[in-house]
From Swiss-Prot:
SUPFAM superfamilies: Mss4-like. PANTHER family: METHIONINE SULFOXIDE REDUCTASE, METHIONINE-R-SULFOXIDE REDUCTASE B1. One of its GO terms (molecular function) is zinc ion binding. NCBIfam families: peptide-methionine (R)-S-oxide reductase MsrB (TIGR00357). This is Peptide methionine sulfoxide reductase MsrB. Its EC number is 1.8.4.12. GO terms for biological process: protein repair; response to oxidative stress.
Length: 143
């Protein structure tokens, strides 16, 4: 991932020193080096509040809470992104597996992977996303 930092496909500029200051070590390793947080440890794995999940690096809105579901995999799972333009997909052949990596389309941050074992009554997709790659913005409660 770090070799993609200057990839012209990603318009959001990233300065490594600034990212290291702003992100936690886990957020940095996940988003910049495609690390994976341990299952069932992420802040948003069990979050059920209404709101929007944003890229922790650039703030792009990525997923709505209405697309989140409990897959039992240990990471937050969504059946679709907020729209088709916010996600970049790339084949990933690491760790002896063939998977589809999911990145933020604005900054290239590694988010997780997408699999074809999601809810069949929705999209059939499971966007398996590291909590460390996300910030959650709760919707204000109505009074």
């Amino acid at each position: 991932m770090s070799g993609d930092r200057d990839d012209p496909r990603y318009p959001y500029p990233k300065d490594d020193a600034e990212l290291r200051r702003r992100l936690t070590p886990m957020q940095y390793e996940v988003t910049q080096h495609a690390a994976t947080e341990p299952p069932f440890t992420g802040e948003y794995t069990d979050t059920e509040d209404a709101g929007i999940y944003h890229c922790v690096v650039c703030g792009t809105a990525l997923f709505e809470s209405g697309a989140k579901y409990h897959s039992g995999c240990g990471w937050p799972s969504y059946f679709k992104p907020i729209d088709g333009e916010v996600i970049d997909e790339k084949m990933d052949y690491t760790h002896g597996m063939t998977r589809v990596e999911v990145r933020c389309n604005q900054c290239g941050a590694h988010l997780g992977h997408v699999f074809e074992d999601g809810p069949r009554d929705k999209t059939g997709l499971r966007y398996c996303i590291n909590s460390a790659a996300l910030n959650f913005e709760a919707k204000p409660e109505r009074k």
